[in-house]
């Protein structure tokens, strides 16, 4: 059996030839064919609808047929048919013949249109399947026709007897049709469902959604919407394309245009327009054969051009349509003729990068569009947008969002989330914080769970005390009564607060519905109705809402509330901390105090470098106070000095002080980048080379953690090409990797260490000279011989580290001994060390040219190794501590005594 598309002469192209029930039967058969995933509508689909659909079963119930047996046989036939290979539905040849037979039956019966009984008779006459199914149950076509065509009797006082099939009269000539009654009488039919148009199937009517009030309010953006309206009002090139980074509000501007069209706040040339957003998911989904995607897009464009009411097509993510490459024909070739003829008015939206990649490479398509740049809003405008959206998110989540939370989200999103744009990233913060609070509100409060645990504990104790003294049991029973009473009170308060929150959510919804009804009444000119809604119902709702919010605020301030219904600044800070790994909670409240005490925090770990610590702290404070170029890193430092004097340790301490964890230190050993080709690893391998998709070691590390201390250790060993890359980082605070992605270094502290000029610094320290100017000249000469001037000029501070003295090493020894005491305390032993021990170890480890590293070896050799041996020998088994003192012979060796 083959299927062909319905021809021009097919009865399916003449719906007027059918009655409403008969046409609905054909439509239901079409749905049945799609349900079976068949690409051909045929007789068996109509039969299954007749016997399985309650809307049509009344037509066949009087017939002597067993529906279950017939449907079982029919499902076997339908299951054997192959599945569809495309989206088109064909009309089977057998169904075409059935419709012709039904038309002949209509002619014999003298009816004006084909009705369901004629279709059933034609099914019984179908030679392939219908006649077989009916004949298997003893129902021939002649009897079928006689059952369905029963004449009525002239009006009489009493109803006539129902004629049998044997007494049915012969067919009446067409010229004199006899009146008849079809059994059973169908119920009144509803209006037939029609197939959705291309715009309905593949688009969203934004103006309809704006009229229904389902679009979010759009605040500000006056200049952008004016530019958009000006381009749409032009005679030619009236197709704007909104170009902006992700999250700046391109789609929101299109929604704002729809809202202004509905409100009548557009020029006369745009009044009454429909703004349809193209649904790319529906347009592309299922287009698995060549040309299907373009065919769907062409049907949309044709319907837009035929529209009398005026349609503007909004194509969000324009590059996915133009650069879809779904087949050999680019969709841009379909847009260009329609745009050139003026049949299509289109608003596109895309990012600058995608616009360059897809649209600008086609000059013919590019000149059809007029660019409208959408820039990221500043903090002030972003704050206004967030405040305008507050009610929508409060309504959705059923919680209250404080203004402090909105300001915090706006500020922290701008400062700590650098890979996205405002207001989108701030909206995400508010949305997720509100969702998290909603989950907490709907969950059981912790105080209730603790009371339930206390009750279970007391009840278990009471069960275990069956043989205990009577006084103890009475005490436990009294405790159970107290805990149970407290738990009942907590549960009652919890339920009351939940009821209040639910009522508040309902009031928020009523407030939103009333505002929409007022706006609609004002648009329609029903000013009395609008006034009644505003000053009667809305006023009542707002009064009740204010009373509930005041009651909840009072309970919160008194500390008696079990549930928290307000999103606060701390919630936003917690969320930013989880997203970025930055301890924003501490920065939120105590950053000023921390910055003012930065020297003391750094000096606890970095010993003997007072000048270096002070210089770093001053530079960080200047940056945090806003006295630096906002495009540059927080600070850039070059640490110079001998090895082991604390250069790397200061970078670690800085990471801990600023970001509360040493993991915020991104460390790169620049000795790994001594060769020219190795420098490419910082930003990633070029296209075509191994490792291109992995990204660069420097750019990927900073992209994952933009708030960090970047330590470039032994920077003088790097290839000169590395410094060319660092120029952009130090000056512009950004670096573009091999994949074209820009990495932000504005929130990074760049620290470079070098051993350059170490001999000069050591010699100056040995000589005891106080001529610091001469030393500075020698250091500058050493730097100039290694680094180019443009690199040195971009560094904020070049900081010298002086060699360590014995008194500095004594302080370092005491820090190391404090760490060792902590380890010994875990074994239950205290550690007491004489002051002479620290002095002795410091003198033994003092080697100015090597810094503090020899001291680590002395500690290990003189203290840790012998102490470990004696611990394993269990010399201190009965002691509670160990005392360490210098030996009596030469003072260089140490002695260990147990403390009883």
From Swiss-Prot:
The record's note on its domains: The Clp repeat (R) domain probably functions as a substrate-discriminating domain, recruiting aggregated proteins to the ClpB hexamer and/or stabilizing bound proteins. The NBD2 domain is responsible for oligomerization, whereas the NBD1 domain stabilizes the hexamer probably in an ATP-dependent manner. The movement of the coiled-coil domain is essential for ClpB ability to rescue proteins from an aggregated state, probably by pulling apart large aggregated proteins, which are bound between the coiled-coils motifs of adjacent ClpB subunits in the functional hexamer.
Annotated region (C-terminal), positions in chain: 804-900
Record region (NBD1): 191-376
Subcellular location, principal: cytoplasm
Protein's job: Part of a stress-induced multi-chaperone system, it is involved in the recovery of the cell from heat-induced damage, in cooperation with DnaK, DnaJ and GrpE. Acts before DnaK, in the processing of protein aggregates. Protein binding stimulates the ATPase activity; ATP hydrolysis unfolds the denatured protein aggregates, which probably helps expose new hydrophobic binding sites on the surface of ClpB-bound aggregates, contributing to the solubilization and refolding of denatured protein aggregates by DnaK.
Region (Linker): 377-581
Residues engaged in binding ATP 2: 641-648
InterPro entries linked: AAA+_ATPase, ATPase_AAA_core, Clp_ATPase_C, Clp_N_dom_sf, Clp_R_dom, ClpA/B, ClpA/B_CS1, ClpA/B_CS2
Quaternary structure annotation from Swiss-Prot or TrEMBL: Homohexamer. The oligomerization is ATP-dependent.
One cellular component term from this protein's GO annotations in UniProt: cytoplasm
Keywords attached to this entry: ATP-binding, Chaperone, Coiled coil, Cytoplasm, Nucleotide-binding, Repeat, Stress response
Annotated Clp R domain residues: 15-154
Alphabetical GO biological process terms: cellular response to heat
Protein name: Chaperone protein ClpB 2
Residue stretches of biased makeup (Pro residues): 154-163
């Amino acid at each position: 059996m083959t299927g062909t598309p319905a021809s021009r002469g097919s009865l399916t192209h003449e719906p007027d030839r059918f009655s409403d029930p008969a046409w609905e039967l054909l439509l239901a058969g079409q749905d049945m064919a799609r349900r079976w995933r068949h690409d051909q509508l045929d007789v068996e689909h109509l039969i299954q609808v007749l016997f399985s659909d309650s809307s049509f079963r009344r037509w066949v119930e009087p017939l002597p047929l067993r529906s279950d047996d017939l449907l079982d046989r029919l499902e076997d036939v339908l299951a054997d048919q192959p599945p569809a290979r495309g989206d088109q539905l064909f009309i089977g040849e057998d169904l075409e013949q059935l419709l012709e037979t039904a038309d002949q039956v209509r002619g014999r019966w003298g009816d004006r249109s084909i009705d369901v009984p004629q279709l059933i008779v034609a099914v019984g006459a179908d030679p392939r399947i219908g006649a077989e199914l009916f004949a298997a149950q003893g129902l021939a076509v002649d009897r079928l026709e006689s059952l369905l065509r029963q004449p009525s009797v002239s009006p009489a006082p009493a109803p006539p007897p129902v004629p049998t099939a044997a007494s049915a009269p012969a067919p009446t000539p067409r010229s004199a049709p006899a009146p008849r009654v079809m059994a059973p009488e169908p119920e009144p039919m509803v209006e037939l469902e029609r197939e959705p148009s291309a715009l309905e199937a593949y688009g969203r009517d934004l103006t309809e959604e704006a009229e229904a009030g389902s679009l979010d309010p759009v605040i500000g953006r006056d200049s952008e919407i004016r530019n958009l309206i000006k381009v749409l009002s032009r005679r030619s090139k009236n197709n704007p394309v909104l170009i902006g980074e992700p999250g700046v509000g391109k789609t929101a501007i299109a929604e704002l245009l729809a809202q202004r069209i509905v409100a009548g706040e557009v020029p006369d040339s745009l009044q009454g327009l429909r703004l349809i957003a193209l649904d790319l998911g529906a347009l592309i989904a299922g287009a698995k054969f060549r040309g299907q995607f373009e065919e769907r897009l062409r049907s949309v464009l044709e319907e837009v051009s035929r529209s009398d009411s005026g349609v503007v097509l909004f194509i969000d993510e324009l590059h996915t349509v133009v650069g879809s490459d779904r087949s050999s024909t680019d969709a841009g070739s379909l847009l260009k003729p329609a745009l050139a003829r003026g049949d299509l008015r289109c608003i596109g939206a895309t990012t600058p990068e995608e616009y360059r990649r897809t649209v600008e490479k086609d000059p013919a398509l590019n000149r059809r569009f007029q660019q409208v740049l959408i820039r990221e809003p500043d903090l002030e405008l972003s704050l206004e947008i967030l405040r305008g959206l507050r009610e929508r998110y409060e309504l959705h989540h059923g919680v209250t969002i404080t203004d402090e939370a909105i300001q915090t989200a706006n500020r922290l999103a701008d400062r700590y989330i650098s890979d996205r744009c405002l207001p989108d990233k701030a909206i995400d913060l508010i949305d997720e914080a509100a969702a998290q609070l909603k989950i907490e509100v709907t969950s059981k409060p912790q105080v209730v769970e603790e009371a339930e645990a206390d009750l279970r504990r007391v009840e278990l104790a009471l069960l275990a005390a069956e043989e205990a003294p009577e006084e103890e049991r009475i005490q436990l029973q009294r405790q159970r009564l107290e805990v149970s009473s407290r738990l009942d009170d907590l549960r009652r308060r919890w339920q009351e607060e939940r009821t209040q929150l639910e009522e508040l959510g309902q009031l928020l919804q009523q407030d939103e519905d009333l505002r929409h009804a007022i706006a609609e009444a004002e648009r329609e000119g029903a000013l009395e109705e609008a006034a009644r809604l505003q000053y009667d119902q809305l006023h009542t709702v707002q009064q009740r809402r204010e009373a509930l919010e005041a009651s909840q605020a009072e309970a919160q301030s008194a500390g008696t509330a079990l549930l928290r219904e307000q999103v606060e600044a701390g919630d936003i800070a917690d969320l930013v901390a989880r997203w970025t790994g930055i301890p924003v909670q501490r920065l939120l409240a105590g950053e000023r105090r921390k910055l003012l005490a930065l020297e003391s925090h750094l000096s606890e770990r970095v010993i003997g470098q007072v000048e270096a610590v002070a210089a770093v702290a001053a530079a960080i404070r200047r940056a945090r106070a806003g006295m630096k170029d906002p495009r540059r890193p927080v600070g850039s430092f070059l640490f110079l000095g001998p090895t082991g004097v604390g250069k790397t340790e200061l970078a670690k301490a800085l990471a801990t002080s600023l970001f509360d964890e040493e993991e915020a230190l991104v460390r790169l050993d620049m000795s790994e980048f001594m060769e020219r080709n190795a420098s490419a690893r910082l930003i990633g391998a070029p296209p075509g080379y191994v490792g291109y998709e992995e990204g660069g070691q420097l750019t990927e590390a900073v992209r994952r953690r933009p708030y960090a201390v970047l330590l470039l250790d032994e920077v003088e060993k790097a290839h000169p090409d590395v410094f060319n890359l660092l120029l952009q980082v130090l000056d512009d605070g950004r670096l573009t990797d091999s994949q074209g992605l820009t990495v932000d270094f504005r929130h990074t502290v760049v620290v470079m260490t070098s051993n350059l000029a170490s001999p000069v610094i050591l010699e100056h320290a040995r000589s005891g000279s106080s001529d610091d100017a001469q030393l500075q000249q020698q250091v500058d000469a050493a730097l100039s011989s290694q680094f180019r001037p443009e690199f040195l000029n971009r560094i904020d501070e070049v900081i010298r580290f002086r060699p360590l003295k014995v008194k500095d090493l004594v302080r370092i020894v005491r820090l190391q001994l404090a760490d060792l005491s902590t380890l010994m305390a875990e074994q239950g032993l205290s550690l007491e060390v004489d002051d002479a021990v620290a002095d002795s170890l410091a003198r033994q480890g003092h080697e100015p040219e090597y810094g503090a590293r020899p001291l680590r070896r002395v500690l290990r050799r003189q203290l840790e190794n012998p102490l470990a041996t004696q611990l394993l020998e269990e010399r201190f088994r009965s002691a509670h501590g160990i005392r360490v003192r210098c030996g009596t012979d030469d003072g260089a060796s140490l002695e260990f005594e147990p403390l009883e």
